[in-house]
Amino acid sequence: MGHSATDLNETRILLYYCFTPIDDPTAVMLWQRALCEQLELKGRILISKHGINGTVGGSLASCKQYVRRTREFPGFKKMEFKWSAGSADDFPRLSVKVREEIVAFGAPDELKVDENGVIGGGVHLKPEEVNKLVEERGDEVVFFDGRNAMEAEIGKFKNAIVPDVRTTHDFISEIESGKYDDLKDKPVVTYCTGGIRCEILSSLMKNRGFEEVYQIDGGIVRYGEKYGDKGLWEGSLYVFDGRMHMEFSDDAATLGRCRACGHATNDFHNCVNEQCREQILLCEECAADPESATCGRKECAEVAAEMVG
């Protein structure tokens, strides 16, 4: 089948996941790697016995073919793909790996999946159902950020609780800490970029006594596509590729503040210390000055001072 000039010239990024039992993750990994290489796609794909989690970029024609051929695998037949602007150039390389978990919560044996997805997860809400829940229950509804705390610095749901986590691995100890026990009888709406982290987080929360847990179908991406900046979402969305962040309209608020001077910015930069490289919010001016372009740790400040000296 031929491709139109548009399909060959235009590029896209695909974001997708599917929880389904996979008997032979290594075989699926080899198939996916060969498929992406053939279609000249770049990105990152993780496969485990629980399913697949991926983001890839390339020509529109290749992305369309990738979707069609990936859905030929029985467990992936109904998998949803989210399309966004971008290309293979937004990724350094193609990485396809088998892992114990497709999201590293540190609970591979607690997670249970069947052909319908995660067993015992939170109730799925479509974007309009999220707004309806808030209309009906008001301030009783709590938005619970299922991402790393850093991501929420540039965008989050209005009045959301942002747990103190640096990585997904920190979530279990955080929700077991007792800090959020007062939420156990409230409607809690978990949210994350595309929905995958909340599939797992919502089930972990329910297993720990949170009674009324929800998750947003398609995550922030789906909600933002529907409501832009006229709904309950505020600011920019952090993304894990060369774009670093995306906005749903030209009216997006700039929530982030430069770590050094406090000016409004949504741009993350790596700490100037090559051994650290922690991502920090910096305006362009402070990012260009080694003395201000550090995460604040003593050893990083010393490296910066040497660079200036």
Curated annotation (Swiss-Prot):
InterPro entries xref list: Rhodanese-like_dom (IPR001763), Rhodanese-like_dom_sf (IPR036873), Rhodanese_C (IPR022111), TrhO (IPR020936), TRHO_N (IPR040503)
- Top EC class, one word: oxidoreductase
Query: GO biological process annotations for this chain's record?
Result: tRNA modification
Source species, domain of life: Bacteria
The record ties this protein, via Pfam families, to:
Rhodanese, Rhodanese_C, UPF0176_N
All residue ranges annotated as the Rhodanese domain in the record:
137-232
Q: Which CDD domains match?
A: RHOD_YceA
Q: What EC number(s) does the entry state?
A: 1.14.-.-
Mind telling me which SMART domains this protein's record contains? RHOD
- Residues of the active site are 192 (cysteine persulfide intermediate)
Q: In which family does this protein belong, per the annotation?
A: Belongs to the TrhO family.
Explain the purpose of this protein. Catalyzes oxygen-dependent 5-hydroxyuridine (ho5U) modification at position 34 in tRNAs.
Listed name of the protein? tRNA uridine(34) hydroxylase
Q: Which organism is it from?
A: Corynebacterium jeikeium (strain K411)
Organism lineage reads as: Bacteria, Bacillati, Actinomycetota, Actinomycetes, Mycobacteriales
Q: Which gene encodes it?
A: trhO
